[in-house]
Amino acid sequence: MTSEVARVVALGASNLTLGIQTAISTARGAFGPSVEVLAANGYGRSYGAASSIAGRTLPGILQSGLWTELDRLERALTRAIIMDVGNDILYGFSPEQILAWVEEAADRLLALTSDVTITDLPLASVKRLSPAKFLFFRSLFFPPCRLSRDEAFARVDEVNAGLIQLAASRHLRLLPLRPSWYGFDPIHFRPAFWGEAWNEILVGRGASVPGPRFSPAEWTRLHTLAPEKRWWLGFEAGTHQRGRTLRRGGRLWLY
């Protein structure tokens, strides 16, 4: 095991949601089978506003119950992750607003731990998009968005520069995302690279930990678990979070 980290707090959206089982497995290998994982995630998640996909609505990460729970829990040696910042660009929020939300999230985490990692944006894979592919992915993932390709790319550059500056000013560990983790889809890690990606995000480049074991059964079960608060077609359908004990080890809170 690489350290005495007892708790992982992860903020993100689709990549965190798709890779949650690999992330937890990586945390077990790096930090032990009793590791606690608290995640504020979800497809299309926004850092500061409610987001809706296919009739399901989640509060912004800053408005989630994660922060109340972190205040309630006894302090533990914590590693925190900030990732998947790009959704808010396609929701139409300004770079200034997005960076203010991420800065607020970082400051809340820094009140709990100095061990905070932030990822940048996948500039290389995004900027490979032709006008036709940009329109396809914009329509697929963000149907209401009307930003042009050039407007979106300019905002991506501005937000990415702001993330780098935030990492420097707050002494966060900045993790540049590897272009090789992406394929046809420019914003989601390829499943074949989930293990490598989560090892670097959670443990760091060059660190050697037991390889994460992908479990389809655990992946499926984790994706059936409800977060603390969500709405389906306007009806609230969340679940109070007590820290679920996972069969393969660890405890999980979802927000």
Question: Where are the regions that the model predicts?
Answer:
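Conserved SGNH/GDSL esterase-like catalytic core that processes O-acyl groups on lipids
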Residues: 2-100
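N-terminal secretory targeting modules
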Residues: 1-42, 135-143, 208-255
